[in-house]
A protein has these predicted regions:
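Polytopic transmembrane helical bundles with strong interfacial aromatic enrichment
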Residues: 1-127
Length: 127
């Protein structure tokens, strides 16, 4: 059962990475200087769905048997998401401006994590 759970977990990790790429694209299409309307509603709504993916990442990490380290790493990604969704509402422009910076950090951390759990999955399948 664990090999299947590890495959599901790896797929969720890659889904998160892909979702972040789509989210950045949605933000770019809304920016008026790039021809957008200035309406970030779709970007915001999809962002909330990404939170569900991040939560599923944590929930699927627990039964995989990959250990405490992977569970804590997935919790860290969820933490980055919580920060990400809070930044636009801080009320201080200098802090709100960290929203795209945190998005980049979340993307890199999620990408590194997805690659690692993909390798973990492959190692389990080969054994």
């Amino acid at each position: 059962m664990q090999p299947l759970l590890r495959q599901v977990h790896a797929a969720v990790a890659w889904l998160l990475v892909g979702s972040i790429v789509v989210q950045v694209w949605l933000a770019g299409t809304a920016i008026p200087q790039f021809g957008g309307t200035g309406n970030f509603e779709t970007h915001r709504n999809v962002g909330y769905l990404i939170g569900l993916v991040a939560l599923v990442l944590v929930l699927t990490a627990i039964p995989t048997g990959l250990g405490r380290r992977r569970i804590l790493q997935s919790l860290g990604i969820l933490g980055l998401y919580i920060v990400q969704s809070s930044l636009p509402y801080m009320g201080v422009n200098a802090i709100e401006a960290l929203h795209p910076v945190n998005a980049a950090v979340m993307f890199v951390v999620s990408l590194v994590y997805a690659r690692a759990v993909w390798r973990d999955r492959a190692a389990t399948a080969a054994a």
